[in-house]
Each structure stands twice: as C-alpha cells, then as structure tokens.
Amino acid sequence: MARGYDETEVKFRLIKLLHSSKSGISGVEISEKLGINRVTMSKYLNKFAAEGTITQKNIGNLNLWFVDEDIEQLNFPDDYFLVQEKFLSHVVDCNERPVYNLIKNCINSKAKMDKIITEIIIPTIPQIKKLFDDGKIGKSEEQLMTGIMLNSIQMITHHSGHSESGKNVIILSADSESLLLSESAAAAFRSQNWNVFSIGDISSSIDVLFDLELRKLLSKTWKSKDGVMIVLVFSQTEEGLKFISDSFYSVK
C-alpha cells in the first residue's frame, strides 16, 4: 500500500463517508472528499472490497461504492467489552448476519484473533448456558445459538496463519456441553500458529477400544515425534476428564 497514509485511519474515514450516503459514492468523489489521489484511493478501495468491508455496484455508467449498515471500524482494545455485549445480544436474538458482520468488523479492525476468542466469544458461552438453565430459552434455541457461535469461531479459523513445525496440540471434548470451549481453544491455538488437531465431541466414541483408537490417532498426528505434543481435554465432569486423561497416559 502507498506510503504516507495510515490504513486504519483511511478505512475509518471511508466507512464514515459511505455511511452518510444511501445511494453510493463514486471512487472519484471518495478520492476528492478524503483528499487522497485517485490511484492510491483505488488501491485502498480494492483492498477493502476484498476484505468484505465495502462493496461495489455498477449503476449505469457509474461504479459506486457502498458499505453495509452493520459495518463499522472498531478501536481495540477499548471496544472488546462493547463488542461482547453486542455479540451476546445478536446471538440471543438469533440474528446471524449481524453476528458475522460483527466478527468481520473485529477482524478488519485488526483485533487479535485470540482476543476475539477470549474477550468476546468465550464470555458468551456461560451466559447462553445460564439462559437455558433458567428456562429462558429452549433446547432448539440453544442449539441454534451454539451453531451461530461455532460459525463465528470458524470465521476466525479461516484467518489464521500457517502452523509452525514442532507446535502440536490435540484438542477434544468429552461431552457435547464442552464443544464450544474446545472449538474456541482450537481457534485460539491456530491463531498462535499451532498445528491443531481438533477432534470435537468424542462422547459417542468412548468404549473398550478407546485406547486403541488413541494409539492410531497419535501415530498419524505425531509421526516424527518432533517438538511438543499437547493434549487438551474439555469436560463438564471430573469422571469424563479422568477417563480420557488416564487413556492418554496409558498410550504415551
């Protein structure tokens, strides 16, 4: 990108400008109003469009730029608490699009991927569980909200970098209630360039052959025995945690 401009500041000013117009603004007009030459502004517009921050529409002979009303530029770390409140509200209302746009806003505003997990998504998990335990939402609503949060976690995973050799972690959930936490942990580790093997909920796979399954798993995921391999288990019960940990100790 061209020198002399702060990308975050350009994006903030651009979003504010586009929000002021319902009919779209041409690239030439954007360049004039932001005081940035056309060539440089064109590069910014194409970059922000590729990120999904803005969109372009051809209307007649004009190419006009728009921004969705849910798109905004955030300031981190100051906005983590505000975003978590919005995230919870949208999830409880089962409004998928605002949830995904909120995560997109976080990513485009340069929030740290692991912080999106720890400051926004993970605090929401017990709040949803409490609503269910208190009888304020039903099972189907809880499942829908869980799916929305899993999709949000997947969005973060898609923006993770390449894994580093020698940093390996197996993450699993001993029950369905721990799935969101295990998937959150997987996304957080991926954001730190770990080579993650996320197994998910294995409660239906626990039987007398479980030790054998673990041997096969380790032989495939850690063939070279290079670096470190961490096994991270999430469980709502001490029994589930102990059973799986004992199984791994038996095959280490």
Provide a role label for each language-model segment:
Residues 36-160:
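Long amphipathic alpha-helical segments
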Residues 34, 64, 204-206:
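Short secondary-structure capping/turn micro-motifs that flank functional sites
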Residues 10, 24-26:
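Residues that mark the N-terminal boundary/hinge immediately upstream of a DNA-recognition element
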Residues 29-31:
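A short acidic, leucine-rich amphipathic alpha-helix
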Residues 1-15, 77-78:
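Short alpha-helical segments that sit at the start of domains
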